Amino acid sequence: MSELISVQALAQCHENEDVLVMDCRFALADPAAGESHYRASHIPGSFYLHLDRDLSGEKGPHGGRHPLPTPEAFTATLSALGVNSEPPTLVVAYDDSGFAFAARLWWLLRYFGHDRVKVLDGGFHAWREAGLPESAAPPKLAGPGNFVARPRPERVVDARQVEAARGQPGVALIDSREAPRFLGLEEPIDPVAGHIQGALNYPWREASRADGTLRSPDEQRGRWGEAAREQDIIVYCGSGVTACVNLLSLAEIGRDDAKLYAGSWSDWCSYPELL
């Protein structure tokens, strides 16, 4: 079953009481931009989730630029918006950045035990292009939900687990950043350029088409090739955000067992002994 929902399908169900839509628009270079765009116009009834405030935890000396939120914090955020674990609410995530931030929410929900989640194919752009209704009105809260975050530790790895796994037979370590960052030719964000030794480069943007929709499963299989057949797949990026697009891509071809190195390169390069 696909992890995506089309704009047409969402238009038919987004007002149902067991469906909640989450606007995840964000810009790393301008953290206020996504929320500003949301206030100007969004899918009617959708709530806004901010990458730094809602989809990440507190930063420390290690753990990367966007650590995972704690179960307690994520429970508080999602339950306050009316998300239920029993019976499970259908959560639909969207953005306008090629799945970069919507996929983060998709992955977090699955990591925290909530599988009833979809990502809007094509994002807000596809919704607007289809001529569907938009709104600037705040959504109505139906009341708190009973969502409880229950982590699935098998879905995530840390730096020491990556160090032990990299280079081992049957392991594909995937770097999701653009090629110039992977090759160490440029590094606009983190203090050290380069990549984890043994990693393969599959830039996250290649998972989608120019119109912002995700490539078909057949296209994804062709893109991944032999890497998707390895026993264990570990995916990272700069801070555990855009790697989730590759995890979404892999889930579409049946590899939803792939793991996220949540701290990613920004965590890895905080350990001098690993460089």
Feature roles, as predicted:
Residues 1-275:
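Cytosolic catalytic domains that perform sulfur/thiol-centered chemistry
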